[in-house]
């Protein structure tokens, strides 16, 4: 093992004789190693490292403060030992690489304050301020790279899912005059919804699918509705691709999918909430169950049927 820092081991508390107190003098120990037990974590270092800076550790190991030792000679410090190795590195080198996460920096700063290491406290405070000033994205939107990835994302999500598929390369014909604008409006609405419902709904993008512009809505791992925004129309005796922007329909399905935020709500209750009011006529219990299942099936078929039912050319 090279350097002054240490071996780190976690000890289990054991019943034994009470620790005894003793005093250290720099002249008596010099560069000899001392053994430290910091909250159950064991460290080896030298008195020279511990006394380089004017800190509480220097007071402990220069004879100004008494220290506790156990029967095996370990010097006991009643603090968490998680960041003590980092503190030793700072005492030896006057600089360290701070942790990446804010919580760990706060923990390290608390220990530095306890040991009165002002230089390390200043480093931690500056790092926390820098992280505070950094821009953090409001939400992250996955982009699908394969059908398996899409399936895995939807099945594992505890939130409702809204997916927008847009892929201009799927078009075989020319676009109608407003199609480009409508495609852009669909994308802009997706971005607005992802910001508005961030944290409540998982929004994903698909740029490799077989459609040109299509919205899909999922709850509890199941597909609930689909809004396809493209159709083929005839203009001047040739086929063209028409992209629409059914804004109201998209909002409606997005609000419907929010009913699936709580996974423990019974499925029948959710399905009934998104369907039309039930008939007032009296039926047997079996007939009611069959009617509900049939109505749900037809609702899904209706939701999926977003194309114009008229024949092409009419």
Swiss-Prot record:
Record keyword Zinc present: no
Q: Where in the cell is it found?
A: Cytoplasm; Nucleus; Endosome
Q: Which residues form the BTB domain?
A: 32-100
Q: Name one GO molecular function term.
A: small GTPase binding
Q: What highest taxon heads this organism's lineage?
A: Eukaryota
Q: Which GO terms describe its cellular component?
A: Cul3-RING ubiquitin ligase complex; cytoplasm; endosome; nucleus
Alphabetized InterPro entries for the sequence:
BACURD1-3 (IPR045068), BTB/POZ_dom (IPR000210), SKP1/BTB/POZ_sf (IPR011333), T1-type_BTB (IPR003131)
Here the disulfide bonds are none
Q: Which GO terms describe its biological process?
A: cell migration; immune response; negative regulation of Rho protein signal transduction; proteasome-mediated ubiquitin-dependent protein catabolic process; protein homooligomerization; protein ubiquitination; stress fiber assembly
Its biological purpose? Substrate-specific adapter of a BCR (BTB-CUL3-RBX1) E3 ubiquitin-protein ligase complex involved in regulation of cytoskeleton structure. The BCR(TNFAIP1) E3 ubiquitin ligase complex mediates the ubiquitination of target proteins, leading to their degradation by the proteasome.
Q: Which PANTHER family match?
A: BTB/POZ DOMAIN-CONTAINING ADAPTER FOR CUL3-MEDIATED RHOA DEGRADATION PROTEIN FAMILY MEMBER, BTB_POZ DOMAIN-CONTAINING ADAPTER FOR CUL3-MEDIATED RHOA DEGRADATION PROTEIN 2
According to the record's subunit comment, the protein's assembly and interactions are: Component of the BCR(TNFAIP1) E3 ubiquitin ligase complex, at least composed of CUL3, TNFAIP1/BACURD2 and RBX1.
Tell me the protein family, please: Belongs to the BACURD family.
Q: Know the name of this protein?
A: BTB/POZ domain-containing adapter for CUL3-mediated RhoA degradation protein 2
Origin species, per record, is: Gallus gallus (Chicken)
What gene name does this entry carry? TNFAIP1
């Amino acid at each position: 093992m090279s350097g002054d820092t240490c071996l780190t081991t976690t000890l289990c508390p054991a019943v034994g004789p009470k620790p005894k107190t003793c005093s250290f003098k720099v002249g008596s120990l010099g560069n000899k190693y001392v053994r430290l037990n910091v909250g159950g974590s064991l460290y080896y270092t030298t008195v020279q490292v511990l006394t380089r800076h004017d800190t509480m550790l220097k007071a402990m190991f220069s004879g100004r403060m008494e220290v506790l030792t156990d029967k095996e000679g370990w010097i006991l410090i009643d603090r968490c030992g998680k960041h003590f190795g980092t503190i030793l590195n700072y005492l030896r080198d006057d600089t360290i690489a701070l942790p990446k996460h804010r919580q760990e920096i706060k923990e390290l700063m608390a220990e530095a304050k306890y040991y009165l290491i002002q230089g390390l406290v200043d480093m931690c405070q500056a790092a926390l301020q820098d992280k505070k000033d950094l821009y953090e994205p409001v939400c992250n939107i996955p982009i699908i790279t394969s059908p398996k990835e899409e399936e895995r994302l939807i099945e594992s999500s505890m939130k409702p899912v809204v997916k927008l598929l847009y892929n201009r390369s799927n078009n075989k014909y020319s676009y109608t005059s407003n199609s480009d604008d409508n495609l852009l409006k669909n994308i802009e609405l997706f971005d607005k919804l992802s910001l508005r419902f961030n944290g409540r709904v998982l929004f994903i993008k698909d740029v490799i699918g077989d459609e040109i512009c299509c919205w899909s809505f999922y709850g509890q791992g199941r597909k609930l509705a689909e809004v396809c925004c493209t159709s083929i129309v005839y203009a001047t005796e040739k086929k063209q691709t028409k992209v629409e922007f059914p804004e109201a329909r998209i909002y409606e399905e997005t609000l419907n999918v929010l009913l699936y935020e709580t996974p423990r709500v019974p499925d029948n209750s959710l399905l009934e909430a998104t369907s039309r009011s039930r008939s007032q006529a009296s039926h047997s219990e079996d007939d009611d169950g069959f009617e509900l299942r049939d109505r749900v099936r037809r609702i899904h078929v209706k939701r999926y049927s977003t194309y114009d039912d008229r024949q092409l050319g009419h």
